[in-house]
């Protein structure tokens, strides 16, 4: 069954989140404290939630309202059963009913580009990393973003 999250689902949602994204526990706590919403969290439930995705509302300049698919994951015991595909298709139906123009996502690794293309996603841009060597001529300090920087970064992007 596919449905939106309820309060009783939180332990299972956090378990799924930690399995998939456990390498950054500080960020996970930050996400749940600041961004998590039941009405944005779509679940696939088999006695308990076993797959999920966040349907975060977002506005793209020149396009308008879109859904940012975030935190898409399936419990390892339930993978390769098409559950994420069902969640994505349901999210498309919900978007259409809400008048949302589309959805975007950022695949976590190269292998996921092919997976998501099966559902109509296309690559719109690439992010490249450039290493800069520090010199005395720099007027600004460049440093790795921290959790506390996320809110101000979200305002820029």
Please annotate each region the language model reported.
Residues 1-54, 64, 68, 127, ...:
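Short amphipathic alpha-helix that is part of the acyltransferase structural core
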Residues 58-69, 79:
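A conserved beta-turn-beta hairpin within the catalytic core of GNAT-like acetyltransferases
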Residues 58, 72, 108-110:
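An acidic- and aromatic-residue-enriched active-site/binding cleft used to recognize and process polar
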Residues 109-111, 127-129:
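Short, flexible active-site-adjacent loop segments at beta-strand->alpha-helix junctions, enriched
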Residues 71-74, 80-93, 118:
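Conserved acetyl-CoA-binding loop-helix of GNAT-fold acetyltransferases
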Residues 88, 95-108:
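Conserved GNAT acetyl-CoA-binding A-motif
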Residues 117-126:
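Conserved acetyl-CoA-binding loop of GNAT-fold acetyltransferases
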Residues 112, 116:
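Basic (Lys/Arg-enriched) interaction patch that binds polyanionic ligands
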